[in-house]
Amino acid sequence: MKVAIVFLSLLVLAFASESIEENREEFPVEESARCGDINAACKEDCDCCGYTTACDCYWSKSCKCREAAIVIYTAPKKKLTC
């Protein structure tokens, strides 16, 4: 009886892991591929990952993703526009 339960558990685990692999193949593009991390090049706030980062073009010649100084303003703005 115990052997049958272990066998069925392994069978269910095998089917579950197969299902997860199929889902990964359906959606190959991850969130990290669509947005930039800190210090990544950007053109607008939506190019930066997370709600606390913004595209900063003010202090440097090239625009880069930086932590926002005013998160209370940046987070709702990114939720509405991105």
Swiss-Prot record:
<comment type="similarity">
    <text>Belongs to the neurotoxin 03 (Tx2) family. 05 subfamily.</text>
</comment>
<feature type="disulfide bond">
    <location>
        <begin position="35"/>
        <end position="49"/>
    </location>
</feature>
<dbReference type="GO" id="GO:0035792">
    <property type="term" value="C:host cell postsynaptic membrane"/>
</dbReference>
<protein>
    <recommendedName>
        <fullName>Delta-ctenitoxin-Pn1a</fullName>
    </recommendedName>
</protein>
<comment type="function">
    <text>This neurotoxin binds at site 3 of insect voltage-activated sodium channels (Nav) and prolongs evoked axonal action potentials by a slowing down of sodium current inactivation. The toxin also inhibits glutamate uptake from rat brain synaptosomes. It reversibly inhibits the N-methyl-D-aspartate (NMDA)-subtype of ionotropic glutamate receptor (GRIN). In addition, the toxin shows antinociceptive effect in all rat pain models tested (inflammatory, neuropathic and nociceptive).</text>
</comment>
<keyword id="KW-1028">Ionotropic glutamate receptor inhibitor</keyword>
<dbReference type="GO" id="GO:0017080">
    <property type="term" value="F:sodium channel regulator activity"/>
</dbReference>
<keyword id="KW-0732">Signal</keyword>
<feature type="disulfide bond">
    <location>
        <begin position="46"/>
        <end position="82"/>
    </location>
</feature>
<dbReference type="GO" id="GO:0005576">
    <property type="term" value="C:extracellular region"/>
</dbReference>
<keyword id="KW-0964">Secreted</keyword>
<feature type="signal peptide">
    <location>
        <begin position="1"/>
        <end position="16"/>
    </location>
</feature>
<feature type="disulfide bond">
    <location>
        <begin position="42"/>
        <end position="55"/>
    </location>
</feature>
<keyword id="KW-0872">Ion channel impairing toxin</keyword>
<keyword id="KW-0528">Neurotoxin</keyword>
<keyword id="KW-0960">Knottin</keyword>
<feature type="disulfide bond">
    <location>
        <begin position="48"/>
        <end position="65"/>
    </location>
</feature>
<keyword id="KW-0629">Postsynaptic neurotoxin</keyword>
<keyword id="KW-0738">Voltage-gated sodium channel impairing toxin</keyword>
<keyword id="KW-1015">Disulfide bond</keyword>
<dbReference type="GO" id="GO:0090729">
    <property type="term" value="F:toxin activity"/>
</dbReference>
<feature type="disulfide bond">
    <location>
        <begin position="57"/>
        <end position="63"/>
    </location>
</feature>
<keyword id="KW-0800">Toxin</keyword>
<feature type="propeptide">
    <location>
        <begin position="17"/>
        <end position="34"/>
    </location>
</feature>
